[in-house]
Structures are given as C-alpha cells and as structure tokens.
C-alpha cells in the first residue's frame, strides 16, 4: 500500500454545492474521470441508455435525472486520497445536504456562467459560512454564451460576501471559447471539444506574450491580454490563509461536459484544500492526529443494495484509524461493537476496506440501532456537536390501501425517518401516521420507496398542521401540565421525542405565550 494512503494529511474530504442544473453531477463525473475512478463519464443525455451518472444510483434518481441522496466517492489524484461527497441537487433535500456539509473540510461551488449566483447557492453558502468552510469556485458551461466573467465575480462578492481570486481566466465563451489562461502558471490551455477522453494533452502555450498565441487564436490573444491587464488591477490576488479561513474563494473557469478546466481545478484543489480539521464535541475538541478512533454518523441510507435490503450508516472518521475487526464503543446505546466489515464507497459500488483514516468516510451495516448524530469511539465518552435536525414545514396524513400492511408501513416509515429522508409523527390521541418533510419532493421519494422497497401502497392526504416544534422543559411539573392540556396537539417523532403540531402559526404563538416554561424548538441536535 502506498505511503500516502497511510497519511491522514493526504486526505481531502469535500462536497460540491450548486443550484440545480449548474452542472454539479457532470463536474463530479469529470473529477472522477481525471482521478482515474471511472473510464467513461455517464452524461445526462445518456440517461435513457444504461449509462447513468455514477453518483445517481438510486432508481428514482435515474428516472428523474437529479441526485437525491448523498453519495460518497473515493479516488486518488497526485498522491492524495480524495473523498467526494455528492449532495442532492434538488432544493427539497436541504436537510440531507446540510448534514453532509458537517462532514467535509471544504467545498466546491459550481456556478452556471449564464445564470450566476442562484437562490440555492445562496442558502448552501450560508451553511458553509456557519463553519467557515473553505470554498473553491468553478464557473461552468463556458462553451455556451453567458455573462461577463468580471460581472460574475462582482456578483459572487456582493451576494455571497466572499472575496474572489481568479486563478484561471476564460479566453472568450460560447462559439468564441478558445481556452483558459492560468494566471499563476502563465500558461494558456487551448480548448478542444469532446467529452469522454481525458484531455490531459490539451495544447499548452507558455507565456501570455508568446507570439505563438497570436498565430493560433488570432485577435482573441489581444483581447485576452487586455482583459488580464484589467483583472490584475481589479481583482484580489490569491491568499492561502484567507481561503483556509473561508474569507476568499479561488475561482476557476471551464466546461465540465467537455472536460475542460477540470484538471487545473483538481490539481490546485489537492495542493491547497485543507486536510482533516479538528472537530468540536460537547466535551473537548478532537484533533485528527490523535491515535484513538473517533467518528460520527452524518447519514443513514436504506437499501443501497435492493437485493440485500440493507441499511448503511455513513461515518466521518475524525481521529485515529479504523482497522478491520476493531472494537468500537457505540456511545448512545452504551455498547461495544466489533466492526469487521466497514465499507468504502465508489457510488453504489461498495468494497470492504481494511483501513480508514481521519477524513475518510466509512459505511457501517446498520440493523436499526444506529441513528444520525451517533458517535463511535474507542471508549472515550464524546458527543460530536453541530449535526442538525430541522422541524418539517410540510405535512401529509398516510393511509394504507391495504389495512393488513400496517406493520410494514410503520417499519418503512421509521427506517426512512432514521435516514433523515422524512420525519414520521404518531399523534398521542390517535393511531394516525403523519409524514413531515422540508420539501415537497421528499413525499414523492417516500411514496416511491414505500411502494417499491417495502411493497406498501398508500394514500397521502393533506392534514391540518402548519408547523411542528420539539418541546422540552427543565420543569417536570410544567411539562406534565402541558402534556395534559395540549394533549390533542402532541405527537411522538421517529426517535420518540415529543413534538407540538400546530394547526396554525397563530396557534403556535399562543401556545408559546401560554406555556412560558416550555421550550418550542424548530431545530435540535441529533
């Protein structure tokens, strides 16, 4: 095994964030292509054939062409091990994406050159700002007409509140797209169209003033020199410390579908992006260079392999190393478990791993005992913080078409809620089951998966609930009185936590005023 495999400093764990259709899945594919992880990139147009994008492996994702669940892919580039966490491209899955961003050390933001900064990008950026996550930016689709690069940089700076430092710069765009200029290497990479081969041998011209440039691209050379002169005066120079502090984003331009500009991005990413970072727990800060193992569960995925009906808990390794057969303490349930079959990931292709270090993501087989937010250590009592759960904003009543399937329905809903795909509530005053979600598409996913994975067909009806809040109190007497008086509005969630289901926002406000000793919470830590 190569030395760099055994060095946690050589790990780079990141996620890609973007608005839907900015080309995130294509960028993911091309990073894997350059990392040697796949030979042929499955394009969006190829979805009707058997060739689907590697990271979109769930049946419903293949039908719709959007990434619904977070995939984990590991590949090697320039003697570094890269863990890429693909996040859902659809806005309804912000919760899953939010939790994924707690498991990474940096992020790559993909922006469509024609559309600029879009709403979802703004939301995801806010999440990254909470943890000062370092961010690189890739402005995509330069093979199409779009907005002026300098205007895009201004927009990123003003809307997202982060300084931009352009590393590469486009030579034209759309039909006039001739290539990119790497400002720090002083090399022009000339554009060649074509999406499947690795274009490592693209024509390179050393030096902005090289007369060969004028011969090959004509008047575009003069335009480029003038633009670069402007850029030097108007933009920020790259500062590594500002990038690592989350204050500056290095910016790259290219066309992912044509493999162009990706290699330059990947080379710099490996060099500049941070390795595994220290992590906060309730007890202390855990450093990645500690010898003993620690990690937390940020995602649970059911039925990654429909043939085996299995569930996998995704664990971010924070310190130490996982070795096959080691014993770990599962702290929430107070049990020691032997882990002999952890998995690493290449989208849906899973392989058993012998070793995982800080920064790596491993998959543990889960038979219903592991939940999102659980901590695993070699005995020390730790609880990693900052893994959020959000109160849902949309609700549906679930009714079975076949009443004899109630056991299968409850099992399916509890498993799907443990994944974080949806939340399930059981009102105290009835046998009803109510689904809660952050976005409307989540209901479609649950209906689809209940039908095909659990063989349960249901009717989903609207229900008179406007919002939900977790309720707590340090005063047992006040809580007991509240449970009695508000009984008809209370329900248990999938983890048996008490929730208040308010029929209107006014009702919630009145309840908060009437019961001042009760805390009504829209988020909670896992």
From Swiss-Prot:
Pfam families recorded: EF-G_D2 (PF22042), GTP_EFTU (PF00009), RF3_C (PF16658)
Residue sites binding GTP per the record: 18-25, 86-90, 140-143
Keywords: Cytoplasm, GTP-binding, Nucleotide-binding, Protein biosynthesis
Gene3D superfamilies: P-loop containing nucleotide triphosphate hydrolases, Peptide chain release factor 3, domain III
MF term (GO), any: GTP binding
Function: Increases the formation of ribosomal termination complexes and stimulates activities of RF-1 and RF-2. It binds guanine nucleotides and has strong preference for UGA stop codons. It may interact directly with the ribosome. The stimulation of RF-1 and RF-2 is significantly reduced by GTP and GDP, but not by GMP.
UniProt-recorded name of the protein: Peptide chain release factor 3
Gene: prfC
């Amino acid at each position: 095994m190569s030395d760099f495999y055994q060095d946690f400093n050589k790990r780079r764990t990141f996620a890609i964030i973007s608005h839907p259709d900015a080309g995130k899945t294509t960028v993911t594919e091309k990073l894997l292509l350059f990392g040697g992880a796949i030979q042929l990139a499955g394009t969006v147009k190829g979805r009707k054939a058997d060739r689907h994008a590697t990271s979109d492996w769930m049946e419903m994702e293949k039908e719709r062409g959007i990434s619904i669940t977070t995939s984990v892919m590991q590949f090697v580039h320039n003697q570094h091990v890269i863990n890429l966490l693909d996040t859902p491209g659809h806005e309804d899955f912000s919760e899953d994406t939010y939790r994924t961003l707690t498991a990474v050390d940096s992020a790559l933001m993909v922006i469509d050159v024609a559309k600029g900064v879009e709403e979802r990008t703004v939301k995801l950026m806010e999440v990254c700002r909470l943890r000062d996550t370092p961010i690189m930016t890739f402005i995509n689709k330069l093979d199409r007409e779009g907005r002026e690069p300098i205007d895009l940089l201004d927009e990123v700076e003003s809307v997202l509140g982060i300084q931009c430092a352009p590393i590469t710069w486009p030579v034209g765009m759309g039909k006039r797209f001739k290539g990119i200029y790497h400002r720090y290497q002083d090399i022009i990479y000339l554009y060649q169209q074509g999406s499947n081969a690795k274009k490592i041998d693209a024509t390179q011209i050393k030096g902005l003033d090289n007369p060969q440039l004028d011969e090959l691209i004509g008047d575009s050379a003069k335009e480029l020199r003038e633009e670069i002169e402007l850029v030097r005066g108007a933009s920020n120079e790259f500062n590594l410390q500002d990038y690592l502090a989350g204050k500056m984003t290095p910016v790259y331009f290219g066309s992912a579908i044509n493999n162009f500009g990706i290699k330059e991005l990947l080379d710099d990413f490996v060099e500049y992006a941070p390795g595994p970072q220290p992590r906060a727990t309730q007890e202390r800060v855990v450093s990645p260079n500690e010898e003993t193992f620690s990690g937390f569960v940020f995602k649970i995925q059911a039925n990654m392999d429909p043939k085996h009906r299995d569930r996998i808990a995704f664990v971010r390794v924070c310190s130490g190393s996982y070795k096959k057969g080691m014993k770990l303490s599962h702290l929430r349930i107070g049990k020691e478990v032997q882990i002999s079959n952890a998995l690493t990931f290449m989208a849906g292709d899973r392989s058993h791993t012998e070793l995982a270090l800080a920064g790596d993501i491993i998959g543990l087989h889960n038979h219903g005992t592991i939940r999102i937010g659980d901590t695993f250590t070699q005995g020390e009592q730790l609880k990693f913080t900052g893994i959020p759960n959000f109160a849902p904003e949309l609700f549906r009543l679930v009714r079975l078409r076949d009443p004899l399937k109630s056991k299968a329905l409850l099992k399916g809903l509890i498993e799907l809620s443990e994944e974080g795909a949806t939340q399930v509530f059981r009102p105290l005053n009835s046998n009803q089951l109510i689904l809660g979600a952050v976005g409307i598409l989540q209901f479609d996913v649950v209906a689809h998966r209940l039908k095909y994975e659990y063989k349960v067909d249901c009717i989903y009806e609207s229900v008179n609930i406007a919002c939900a809040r977790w309720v707590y109190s340090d005063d047992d007497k006040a809580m007991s009185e509240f449970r009695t008086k508000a009984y008809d509005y209370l329900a248990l969630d999938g983890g048996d936590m008490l929730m208040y289901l308010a029929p209107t926002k006014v009702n919630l406000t009145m309840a908060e005023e009437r019961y001042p000793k009760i805390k009504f919470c829209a988020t909670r830590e896992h």
